């Protein structure tokens, strides 16, 4: 399997491994609702939070949705979104490794990204999860109308990369029904008088 190398990769991986594990502590002042619920909001650095989840949830999470910084060049309150590619990769790699460790054998991870870091994200996910565990690239149109203020070609599409933990992972498909069959739509249009056949 090919490996993506960048400046600072080994240092970033070593630094992430050196981050100590912390136990999660409930803050009653910030708590709301049923104290026995399994739902939680974790405030803090996501690397430390992921490490804190491992003792409780390693190998048991069925679905992770990750929305990392897109590296757009914009400044956000909680993270810098204007990183060098190598810095961005060094940020993402150890977090993705921890997310992989949290996934159950039938688990999957769904990661939002745009074109700026899509190729790099795909390569490190192939390395971490395995090329054969790639499920799909879901492309979705985020903008439906062109703007006249664009300085170049407008990017209207974003991506969601989907990987499974193992190659044996099967999607939860809904059973096919007549309501989803293409012919039923044609029958609807015909009987509604919208089209004539």
Q: Which residues make up each language-model segment?
A:
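DnaQ-like (DEDDh/DEDDy) 3′-5′ exonuclease domain used for proofreading
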Residues: 1-65, 72-86, 91-94
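Structured core elements
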Residues: 41, 65, 110-112, 139, ...
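Short, flexible loop/turn elements at secondary-structure junctions
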Residues: 46-48, 70, 115-117, 142-144, ...
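Short, solvent-exposed loop/turn and secondary-structure capping segments
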Residues: 53, 74-79, 121-123, 149-150, ...
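Short, surface-exposed basic-aromatic patches at helix termini and helix-loop junctions that form
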Residues: 55-58, 123-131, 154-155
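Conserved Class I SAM-dependent methyltransferase catalytic core
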Residues: 85-139
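Flexible, glycine-/basic-rich loop-and-beta segments that form/coincide
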Residues: 142-197
């Amino acid at each position: 399997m090919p490996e993506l190398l960048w400046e600072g990769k080994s240092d970033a991986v070593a630094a992430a491994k050196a981050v100590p594990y912390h136990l999660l502590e409930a803050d009653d002042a910030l708590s709301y609702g049923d104290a026995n619920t399994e739902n939680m909001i974790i405030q803090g650095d996501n690397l430390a939070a992921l490490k804190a989840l491992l003792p409780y949830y390693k190998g048991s999470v069925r679905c992770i949705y990750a929305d990392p910084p897109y590296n757009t060049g914009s400044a956000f309150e909680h993270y810098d979104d204007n990183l060098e590619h190598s810095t961005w990769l060094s940020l993402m790699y150890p977090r993705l490794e921890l997310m992989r460790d949290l996934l159950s054998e039938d688990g999957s991870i769904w990661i939002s990204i745009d074109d700026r870091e899509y190729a790099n994200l795909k390569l490190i996910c192939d390395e971490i999860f395995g090329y054969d565990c790639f499920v799909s690239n879901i492309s979705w149109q985020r903008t439906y109308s062109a703007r006249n203020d664009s300085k170049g070609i407008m990017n209207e599409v974003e991506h969601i990369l989907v990987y499974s933990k193992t190659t044996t992972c099967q999607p939860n498909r809904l059973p096919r029904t007549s309501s989803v069959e293409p012919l039923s739509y044609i029958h609807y249009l015909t009987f509604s008088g919208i089209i004539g056949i």
